[in-house]
Each structure stands twice: as C-alpha cells, then as structure tokens.
C-alpha cells in the first residue's frame, strides 16, 4: 500500500480558522482578514487602515469597551510597520473577559492610520508613544506630538533601520 503524503500544501497550511469575533464581523459585512492566533490563543484580526474606524466602532458596539493596549512594532528594515490594538469585553462579574487583537499593517514610507482616541480615550498617550517611537501618524488625534523624546529629536528611535546620531564615534582606548 502506498504511503499517503501527510504534509499540507502551502495553501492548506495558510488557511486560518476564523474565530468568533471574525465570524461576527463577517456576518455584519466588515472586511478584514483572520490571522493565526497568538501563543495564548487570542484571536488576531488584520484590517486595512481606511477600515479601522468602522471596524473598531463595531467592536465597541459588540461590547469591546476597553482598550487594554495600543502599540506598534517594526517588521524590519524596508518592511512594514504595524499598529495594534488589544481589546477586551469588560463587565461586572466577568472573570475571564473576551479578548481580540486588531492589527493594521502600514507602509514605512507613509505610515498613516486613523486615531481610535474618539472610541477609546485610553488611546491618547499610547498613540502618542507609537508616533514618537515609530513615526506612525494617527490622523484625528487631538494632541499628536512627541511624548518621550525631545520635541526637536530627529527620526524614530525604535525603527529597526534607525541609526543613533553620534553613537558610532571613535572612542579613545585606555
């Protein structure tokens, strides 16, 4: 009897099962993509920047009333920047709140995404930090300016292609 090939094709390996939140968004006509769950099983949803506000407004209406964390990261020199939003359904007598993470992948040349400040006020300083460290512009933010670095700082220090000024100067050997 011939042995059957048990290795999945790249297409089969790339299929990600949609979670409950993704299914709810699909049923309500919101365009998005389900990504693989994280190490702790939290559902991750990818959305285009222009659809972030409608999708986040819907998530708020569906009960995701708490922005636990907003942040950003760099996928590497020449690659995209990512702005992410970790949301929870918080309520009375809830010991294990439902969680979802929304990610927006942005081009590093012009990383612009709408601010979610008007949905979750807790995004205020978190979006400012992402702007300060990565240069992601949060359109509609009421006070988008540097929060950690001096106002006259040049560049975005947490980008992987950032070179610190005067860091590589020659040092005297003693």
UniProtKB/Swiss-Prot annotation:
Subcellular localization(s) per the UniProt record: Cellular thylakoid membrane
Keywords: Membrane, NAD, NADP, Plastoquinone, Quinone, Thylakoid, Translocase, Transport
Pfam family, one: Complex1_30kDa
Reactions listed under catalytic activity: a plastoquinone + NADH + (n+1) H(+)(in) = a plastoquinol + NAD(+) + n H(+)(out); a plastoquinone + NADPH + (n+1) H(+)(in) = a plastoquinol + NADP(+) + n H(+)(out)
GO terms under cellular component: plasma membrane-derived thylakoid membrane
A Gene Ontology biological process term: photosynthesis, light reaction
GO molecular function, one term: NADH dehydrogenase (ubiquinone) activity
Annotated membrane topology: Peripheral membrane protein
EC number: 7.1.1.-
EC main group: translocase
Family, similarity comment: Belongs to the complex I 30 kDa subunit family.
NCBIfam families: PRK12494.1 (NF009141)
Matches recorded under PANTHER family: NADH DEHYDROGENASE [UBIQUINONE] IRON-SULFUR PROTEIN 3, MITOCHONDRIAL, NADH DEHYDROGENASE UBIQUINONE IRON-SULFUR PROTEIN 3
Free-text function comment from the UniProt entry: NDH-1 shuttles electrons from an unknown electron donor, via FMN and iron-sulfur (Fe-S) centers, to quinones in the respiratory and/or the photosynthetic chain. The immediate electron acceptor for the enzyme in this species is believed to be plastoquinone. Couples the redox reaction to proton translocation, and thus conserves the redox energy in a proton gradient. Cyanobacterial NDH-1 also plays a role in inorganic carbon-concentration.
Assembly and binders: NDH-1 can be composed of about 15 different subunits; different subcomplexes with different compositions have been identified which probably have different functions.
The protein's name: NAD(P)H-quinone oxidoreductase subunit J
Organism: Picosynechococcus sp. (strain ATCC 27264 / PCC 7002 / PR-6) (Agmenellum quadruplicatum)
The encoding gene: ndhJ
């Amino acid at each position: 009897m011939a042995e059957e090939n048990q290795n999945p094709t790249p297409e089969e390996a790339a299929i990600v099962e949609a979670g409950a939140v993704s299914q709810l968004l699909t049923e309500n006509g919101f365009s998005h993509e389900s990504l693989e769950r994280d190490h702790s099983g939290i559902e991750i949803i990818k959305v285009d920047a222009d659809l972030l506000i409608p999708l986040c407004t819907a998530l708020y209406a569906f009960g995701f009333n708490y922005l636990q964390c907003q942040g950003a990261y760099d996928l590497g020199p020449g690659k995209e920047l990512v702005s992410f939003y970790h949301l929870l359904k918080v309520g009375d007598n809830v010991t294990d709140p439902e969680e979802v993470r929304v990610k927006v992948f942005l081009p590093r040349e012009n990383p612009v995404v709408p601010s979610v400040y008007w949905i979750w006020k807790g995004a205020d300083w978190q979006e400012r930090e992402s702007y300060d460290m990565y240069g992601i512009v949060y359109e509609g933010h009421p006070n988008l300016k540097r929060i950690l670095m001096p106002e006259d700082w040049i560049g975005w220090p947490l980008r992987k292609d950032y070179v610190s000024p005067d860091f590589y100067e020659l040092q005297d050997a003693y």
